[in-house]
Design a protein with these regions (language model features):
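N-terminal capping/small domains of soluble enzymes
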Residues: 2-75, 81-84, 268, 316-329, ...
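Active-site-proximal beta-alpha core segment in soluble small-molecule metabolic enzymes
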Residues: 34-199, 221
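Glycine-rich beta-strand-to-loop/alpha-helix junction loops that act as flexible
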Residues: 39, 170-171, 200-209, 237-239
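Feature marks short, surface-exposed loop/turn motifs that line or immediately flank catalytic pockets
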Residues: 130-132, 172, 208, 241, ...
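Charged helix-capping and loop-helix junction motifs
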Residues: 180-185, 214-220, 250, 315
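Acidic/histidine-enriched ion/cofactor-binding microenvironments in catalytic or ligand-binding pockets
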Residues: 188, 194-197, 217-228, 314-327
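Charged (often Lys/Glu-rich) extended helix/loop segments that serve as interaction or gating elements
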Residues: 221, 235-375
Length: 375
């Protein structure tokens, strides 16, 4: 079965592109002498973990469930960070994780000693108060009032007695130049501590596999930090692992005319690609162009009752007909990890596409998946 034959709606993962991304990340690991971890919050299709784990050193989790999934399905290190931990979750985490990073001094003092007794390496998240995000203020952990990380004025005096390593995460879909800027701020504020700890985790948001990313600068900065402070370095990209490695296949169910032609699809921004609203952004579409760029412009909408469930305006070289198929691109990341069944809309099936373009069904969803979440 080829992509054009897959029943819609469906997420289709391009295994060749996924592996190509992983090879780039493996190159960074080897050249920089660091460890690259998969941030599961962006991509957690665990049936592909055997492939990814051939290239990466482990995973990072945002809580108990992701940590359990990693320990069960992904060979390698398991790291965990959360703004706060429940006592019952911590009890289970101690048996399955290698690193736990705390967000505050209070959380560190509450759980840190238990972690060390269990053989878990302990870290503290820093807030270098260095904002480098121009278009993603919603995702800026260094924004005023952010709940993430400890600022330099809140560092506990006995920090080095409490932690093995330090962590920061300030980037979102950014380049190595922004990491370089952030590292300068981290060194200026926290440099004395870096000389004393064992490891530094530089977090995620590194768009390493994006075309034009300065991989050489990333490698040189990691090498510099390693040499200067004698540290083990971790980075934990999410999007970079599966960037441009997935499609959302959809069908045109109807065309409504109201000042313009509106396509009603069997895919939904609200249900199937919520980042359209949360970033917000306009997802790339195969053979689709900017509004008015080509001869035929349409508004792409969804089959829900939410008026604002609109994906965006696109133009096409040829008219679109009812029954035509459209393919949204870069749909492996922050898609099925965030989707939902609002309005009783079904979840898209999951397919894997091999190097020959043949697609195989991984999982199909139905009514019981909708009903099973309710009672």
């Amino acid at each position: 079965m080829k992509l054009e034959q897959v029943p819609t709606p469906a997420y289709v993962i391009d295994l060749a592109k996924l592996e190509a991304n992983c090879r780039i990340l493996q190159y960074v690991q080897e050249e920089a002498g660091c460890k690259v971890l998969l941030a599961q919050k962006a991509y957690s299709l665990y049936k592909t973990y055997p492939l990814i784990s051939q290239y990466l050193s482990g995973t990072t989790a945002s809580g108990l469930y992701e940590a359990k999934l990693a320990r069960e399905e992904f060979p390698g290190e398991v790291h965990v960070f959360a703004p706060a931990f429940k006592d019952e979750d911590m009890e289970e985490l101690l048996g399955i994780t290698d690193h736990i990073v705390f967000n505050s001094e209070r959380q560190l003092r509450k759980h840190g000693s238990r972690c060390r007794e269990a053989g878990v390496s302990v870290g503290l998240r820093l807030n270098p108060q260095c904002s480098t995000q121009g278009d993603h203020a919603l995702y800026d952990p260094c924004a005023p009032g952010s709940r993430f990380g400890v600022t330099i004025d809140k560092i506990p005096s006995d920090l080095l007695d409490l932690v093995d390593g330090l962590h920061f995460h300030t980037l979102c879909e950014q380049g190595a130049d922004d990491l370089q800027t952030t590292l300068k701020a981290v060194e200026e504020q926290f440099g004395p501590y870096l000389h004393e700890v064992k490891w530094l985790n530089m977090g995620g948001g590194h768009h390493i596999t994006r075309e034009g990313y300065d991989v050489d600068l990333l490698i040189s900065e990691i090498k510099r930090i390693r040499k200067t402070y004698n540290l083990e370095i971790y980075i934990e990209p999410g999007e970079a692992i599966a960037l441009n490695a997935g499609y959302l296949a959809t069908e045109v169910l109807d065309i409504v005319e109201n000042g313009m032609e509106i396509l009603v699809l069997d895919a939904s921004a609200t249900c199937h690609m919520p980042d359209v609203f949360e970033m917000p952004y306009r997802p790339p579409l195969r053979n689709g162009f900017e509004s008015q760029e080509k001869a035929h412009t349409y508004r792409l909408s969804s089959n829900t009752c939410l008026t604002g469930d609109v994906i965006g305006d696109y133009s096409f070289e040829n008219p679109v007909q009812i029954g035509d198929r459209l393919y949204f691109q870069d749909m492996a990341i922050y898609s099925f990890v965030k989707n939902n069944t609002f309005n009783g809309i079904g979840l898209p099936s999951l397919y894997l596409m091999d190097e020959q373009g043949d697609c195989s069904l991984l999982k199909a969803f139905g009514y019981q998946d909708f009903k099973g979440r309710l009672s």
